[in-house]
Amino acid sequence: MPGFGTTEATQKNATQLMQCLGLTIETIDIRESCFRMFQDLKHRPFGLSLEGKTWRSLQAEMEQLPDDKRNDLVFENVQARMRTTLLMNKGFVIGTGDLSESALGWSTYNADHMSMYNVNCSVPKTLVQFLVRYVAMNRFDGDVRKILLEIADTPISPELLPLSKNKAMHQSTEGTIGPYELHDFFLYHFVRCGAAPSKILYLAKQAKFHNEYTAEEIATVLRTFLKRFFAAQFKRSCVPDGPKVGTVSLSPRGDWRMPSDADPTAWLSDQ
């Protein structure tokens, strides 16, 4: 379901992987339907008028946007929800969201946040990448192995913001919220061990993260983690079923109960 931010590389890898695995391929371009939604909402993407335009002319205009003008949450959410709408109207939706995204609220509410069953709900992002590489090297060979390794090495991005004129991607998840290897480390010690932020910072130093990041960078990412973890509870209070894998789970029905209006101030002051 290509949208305004879909890159040629990710679309190619998805298509080729399905071909190699013998799956049926069905492509639905969501740009026209999203454009009509913008019109219905009277929304001006990135402040651009839609009068007398088509989605193609809008895309051409968005390619010229400077980097500091490529921010529009409604533009992103419409695309994410359009994909979920199409999927749910056609069949049983298997969720793709993982534990890290759930912890950080890195999803669109009632879009990729929702499904009929979420198989990765307790698998952190770093483990997802490890498993893709493991399967590539131990279960497949040839083209499938090559494609899976390319997917694992692809910069993490929702690809919802418009591409530049040279079709380059301008949206990096880790560039926005920080490295997932730090977030997953924080998540484990915060939820599984109940560690205070000050102890988590100490443990991060013992884990040698200071070889890759400065103490200030680690502390900044931890603050981001805490703020987003508390702010995202309302999303975790409404999630589909899924299996528990490992020792950390954020299911509101089993392992994690938390009020959606909890205040992170006490935790933030402990750094």
Model-derived features: positions:
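ATP/NTP-dependent adenylation/nucleotidyl-transfer catalytic domains that generate, transfer
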Residues: 1-271
